[in-house]
Amino acid sequence: MLCCCVNSENNKKYAELDAKLARKMVESRSIYPGHRSLKSMDSIIMKFPKLREGLRNIRSVFESYDNDTNGTIDIEELKKCLEELKLSLSDEEVKGLYSWCDVDGSKGIQFNEFIVLLCLIYLLAKPSSESSTESREMGPKLVESIFDPIVEVFLFLDKDGKGKLNKADVIKTLNNEDYPLERSPSHVTNMRFEEMDWGRKGKVGFREFLFAFMSWVGLDDADDDFMSS
């Protein structure tokens, strides 16, 4: 009975975090105008090499805070990292995001989970107001230069602006009739959405998008692998 209560409480916390992220993505449309410059999947793929380089730099950050060199970061190591990066959230929010991103239940954050976790914290820690001078200054330039373009890709795919991706919009965007030479095969677009839609609900939140997007970008893969697989 206790286990069921704990799981229910955790699910409620995760649902609240998911809803908060969705609201943040809606608010972000005016803060990240770069999403309007994206026209097709090719324009997204062109960002992959720079993002891949940035992710390699993030690995250096990860390794510098993995004090016991076990390939994971625990909650205390994460807090030290966030303090150094000047990213501030409440302890409760950090703990909730930490467990939410520990998708394999290993009680430690691995590198791919760390990227997603750091991006979520960066996004939620930033002010929502476009007029705030801190909104473009918070956090190191390294983190901003990597995560801002990823947010813009999500906003590009989120055509209805509700903070969630739905299958019809994503497929329509990737098969944009205005760019016939850059259209993705239908089986590829369906597969890409399924990679994001873990619960097979037809809706994808920012966290699920992040995990899928990291695998698309890769750290060692060639750019054309994304379109041909």
From Swiss-Prot:
Pfam families, per database record: EF-hand_7 (PF13499)
Chain positions recorded as Ca(2+) binding sites: D66, D68, N70, T72, E77
GO MF terms held by the record: calcium ion binding
PROSITE patterns: EF_HAND_1, EF_HAND_2
CDD domains with a match to the protein in the record: EFh
Keyword line: Calcium, Metal-binding, Repeat
Highest rank taxon of the organism: Eukaryota
InterPro entries named in the record: CML21-like, EF-hand-dom_pair, EF_Hand_1_Ca_BS, EF_hand_dom
Keyword Calcium attached: yes
Cross-referenced SUPFAM superfamilies: EF-hand (SSF47473)
Function noted in UniProt: Potential calcium sensor.
Name under which the protein is recorded: Probable calcium-binding protein CML22
Species assigned in the record: Arabidopsis thaliana (Mouse-ear cress)
Lineage: Eukaryota, Viridiplantae, Streptophyta, Embryophyta, Tracheophyta
Gene, per the UniProt record: CML22
